[in-house]
Design a protein with these regions (language model features):
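Conserved PDZ fold ligand-binding element
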Residues: 8-28
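Short acidic catalytic loops
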Residues: 15-22, 122-140, 200
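Flexible, solvent-exposed loop/hinge segments that line or gate ligand/substrate-binding clefts
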Residues: 221-256
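Gly/Ser/Thr-rich loop/hinge elements
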Residues: 140-198, 236-238
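Terminal peptide-recognition signature
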Residues: 7, 15-18, 44, 96, ...
């Protein structure tokens, strides 16, 4: 659940089923009411399996209680969704769920990058020596953010070495760019000097998220856990139509 969201305030958790709303079961009849986003009373259930006397397993959703969910409202879903240090088998594992490569909102262009730096500073202070990077829901974003993330993950002796090549078309060779592991980007963050990173993926993992995986691979052990990623090894740039208010994300270069 997004921190501070109506769903979090209502106590909803992963695995909960919404069985009833305002006394009615969830059917086509209440669909319009569901979409209105007003305050509603919810009956919550969980799925349980029961083994019968004959050994047959049956399952179903059983109610566990009711809760009131406040009305929907605008909410900033920050890229650093969750981070923590997990003690495991004598080691300290850093876990980061990073959902978008975005530096910050328009009101503070580095706010989200500073959240990322703060997380890595805490990882370093906590003595993290293993790392899990959760990119399951990350569909890409800014290359600058990827450069920052990679710089804080990579082995310390790889600083200033080549991270990625951005190659444009023959008509835009002047835009070609080489990205490095740039320690100047770290600022208030920290380099963890890791030798291995475990990356959680789904088929929604794409674009810049895949660049991080591919560009770290020559310098450290990258272990993928999950399903195959989308396979979009290119950089895109959003173009906003001035009057019709739609956005096109056009491919602008290849990333190697």
């Amino acid at each position: 659940m997004v921190p501070g969201s109506p769903a979090e305030e209502a106590g909803l958790q992963r695995g909960h089923w919404i069985m009833m709303m305002n006394g009615d079961y969830i059917t086509k009849k209440v669909e319009s009411e569901l979409l209105q986003g007003s305050t509603r009373q919810l009956q919550i259930g969980v799925y349980k399996e029961v083994v019968g006397e004959d050994g047959e397993v049956t399952g179903g959703v059983v109610p566990i209680g009711e809760t009131t969910m406040p009305a929907s409202r605008s909410l900033a879903d920050k890229p650093v969704h969750r981070f923590e240090i997990i003690p495991w088998n004598g080691k300290k594992v850093g876990y980061l769920m990073y959902n978008e490569f975005k530096a910050g909102p328009t009101t503070d262009s580095q706010a989200y990058n500073d959240d990322l730096r703060r997380a890595f500073r805490d990882f370093q202070t906590g003595g993290v020596n293993e790392f899990v990077l959760d990119l399951r829901y990350n569909t890409g974003g800014s290359l600058d953010c990827a450069q920052l993330l990679c710089t804080m993950l990579a082995p310390a002796d790889k600083m200033n070495q080549l991270l990625a090549l951005l190659r444009y078309s023959d008509k835009r060779v002047e835009a070609n760019q080489d990205l490095t592991f740039n320690p100047e980007l770290i600022q208030s963050g920290a380099n963890l000097d890791l030798s291995t990173v475990y990356v959680l993926t789904t088929n929604a993992t794409r674009g810049v998220a895949e660049m991080v995986i591919n560009c770290l691979n020559p310098y450290m052990k990258v272990v993928l856990i999950g399903t195959k990623t989308a396979g979009e090894y290119v950089a895109t740039k959003p173009f906003v139509h001035p009057t019709d208010r739609f956005i096109l994300n056009l491919v602008v270069c290849n990333v190697y």
